[in-house]
């Protein structure tokens, strides 16, 4: 059985599938759920990275590197959420095509700019839509940059704060900042725990 860390990121999305029993496969071979990346040891998000990789939601950019501080893309999140929903994301003209189709069909994203870096507020908004756009009752005024949250993302950010999905950093939400792969892993892990 290959380990998740043995899969190369660029090829991963075109070969990955979710089995009916919840296990993951790579080219039809069940994936062993452990990964060790040289660049995540001691990283603040190491646990979240290991958990999301173990769940088959993420893979490394190489067999030994996760690139935790690299920006995530919109297509990446669409694909990860499609996979989390149990959708087979293999095939398609691009690695993100099946995830993008799923995101558009399910109202999670309009499918635009899949290769663009995803901002923190875009990330939270996609998660919020995935969750069914529940009532938002969190307060953002404890964060010094709350006024920089775009109007389209306000309810999503309030919901994410209220549910502990987003905690901010140094009293800021940084909604306009690009989300790193580590931040996506951490936010996604909290979202998955909340969704159980």
Where are these regions (language model features)?
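Feature responds to low-complexity, polar/acidic, surface-exposed segments characteristic
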Residues: 8, 12-46, 59-121, 127-153, ...
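Phosphate/pyrophosphate-binding loop motifs in nucleotide- or prenyl diphosphate-using proteins
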Residues: 56, 164
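Extracellular/luminal Pro/Thr/Ser-rich low-complexity repeat and linker "mucin-like" segments
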Residues: 44-54
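Extracellular, surface-exposed repeat/solenoid domains
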Residues: 1-3
């Amino acid at each position: 059985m290959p380990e998740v860390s043995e899969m190369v990121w660029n090829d991963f999305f075109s070969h990955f599938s979710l089995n009916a029993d919840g296990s993951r496969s790579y080219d039809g071979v069940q994936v062993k759920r452990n990964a060790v990346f040289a660049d995540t040891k001691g990283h603040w998000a190491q646990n979240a990275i290991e958990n999301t990789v173990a769940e088959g939601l993420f893979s490394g950019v190489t067999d030994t590197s996760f690139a935790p501080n690299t920006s995530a893309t919109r297509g990446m999140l669409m694909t990860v959420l499609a996979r989390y929903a149990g959708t087979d994301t293999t095939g398609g003209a691009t690695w993100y095509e099946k995830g993008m189709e799923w995101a558009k069909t399910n109202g999670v994203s309009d499918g635009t700019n899949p290769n663009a870096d995803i901002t923190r507020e875009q990330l939270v908004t996609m998660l919020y839509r995935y969750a069914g756009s529940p009532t938002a009752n969190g307060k953002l005024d404890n964060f010094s940059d709350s006024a920089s949250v775009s109007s389209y993302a306000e309810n999503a950010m309030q919901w994410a704060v209220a549910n502990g999905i987003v905690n901010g950093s140094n009293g800021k939400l940084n909604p306009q900042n690009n989300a790193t792969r580590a931040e996506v892993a951490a936010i996604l892990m909290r979202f998955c725990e909340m969704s159980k």
